[in-house]
Amino acid sequence: MSGVVESVEHEERFVLTRAQVTRFFAAIGRHATVETYDQARPIAYTRTTYFDTDDSFYLRSCHGPIARRLRLREYAMAASLEDAPVLSAAACLELKQNTGTARSKVRIQASPTLLRMLIERRGLRDPAFASMDPLSALPTLQSELSIPTIAPRLTTWYRRAAMTAESGRLRITLDERLTFCRPQIIGVVGAEVAPNAADIVASGPARILEIKHWGERPLWLARALEGMEPAHGFSKFKMGMEAISRKLEALVRPIAAERDAEADAQRDAETALTGTSDFASIPGAV
């Protein structure tokens, strides 16, 4: 989870069935190494909070030549699938940009407390930021945070398994049980961070395979992926924002319908009163 500035690589995504996942990992087992960040808590989770503006600056970029996302990444660990995941001391803020399968990141890593301060100061400088890694990424991220109306809009949560191969030039991740949530505040190290039912907006695909690599795919990987179609248009950010929008519409629609019904009733009452008055004013009408 080290800081990376302007790293450029290729990224492919696949939305898979359980059988496809089983077959894929059986095929690559001897070529890739499992990443474990905490031996005592080997089950890893990722919580990602996406930022956007009131006019959907970042969401609109998903439909252009360069898709941009500003996001906060927090990591949680658990001893087993039954245990509650707790927040780790590692967190990062990053600007991710995609053009086709090519992607680049400007990322800074720091404690959740320090990143909270960076976000709240909206790009203003502070001596405390000197400890961030790498410091060269700070101006770019401060510039993004200074955009008017920038604010957290969506949080995603999923369990992640990661593997590396080809001397680190290839990274494979499997995200399971993707969940879209209302935006969450930055957590406290050691706190339980699994989303509660009140914060959950919708569920995403059950299994998402992501391949990040520099250069061409190795032959063994190409063989393992045979018969699997890349999900070219898939985006956690885009799907999650659409889910948030649908949720808001579902909440607003009954309120708007009730307001319209009240307005119609008021107009009917006013029309009835006006009609009585007009009729009574006609000479000879009794």
Model-derived features with residue positions:
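Phosphate-end processing signature that detects enzymes handling 5′-triphosphorylated RNA
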Residues: 1-286
